[in-house]
């Protein structure tokens, strides 16, 4: 049985008061401006840790996030939340930390879908945020390294990126954040000066991939 089945409509328990308050505050917030230059934009790398890669069967174990502000990466500006049997508090903390900044993931087909599914099952909504997927953006910005959608470890090797622990929500988030820093630098140098430009690059690459 899917581990989220106990949270489906009709059996979903009430949210803890603290989590409900954080979610309500987030829902009242305003989305960030996508036209600001990168050094004025707060980007948040969001990553998950799960028991496996099966969206229907595997369980979300933890969420992590690292903020990049002013094109500056500080490991202390981070969030890590292991999720127990009730993920409500961890999800609420993620919303509070990430806010309405662009949420940057690597492999949205898994991480985004998993997060949206858990949010819907436990909190009865999917966060309406701007998602960006480095798995698509990196080959568009650095075709000299890879031209297709490759694994995170491949990009880490290309850039000499290291982290304190692989296959850990925060450890991999730190690696992704370092790649995002490189992506922001290359994007700025090539005239993609804001989040809106990066969104268009990703959208164009996905469209071209579908039409090939």
Predicted segments with their positions:
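Acidic two-metal-ion nuclease catalytic site recognized across multiple nuclease folds
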Residues: 1-32, 181-212
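Conserved RNase H-like, two-metal-ion catalytic cores of nucleic-acid enzymes
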Residues: 35-93
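A contiguous, mid-protein "functional segment" used to position or interact
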Residues: 46, 165-191
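Short, glycine/acidic-enriched loop or turn micro-motifs at the edges of active sites
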Residues: 50-52, 110, 136, 175
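Conserved DEDDh/DEDDy metal-dependent 3′-5′ exonuclease domain
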Residues: 76-144
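Active-site catalytic microenvironments for nucleophilic, acid-base chemistry
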Residues: 121, 140, 158, 182-186
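Short, polar/flexible loop-turn hinges at active-site or ligand-entry regions and domain interfaces
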Residues: 122-128, 163-165, 188
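Active-site-proximal helix-loop-helix substrate-binding element of RNase H-like nuclease domains
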Residues: 139-177
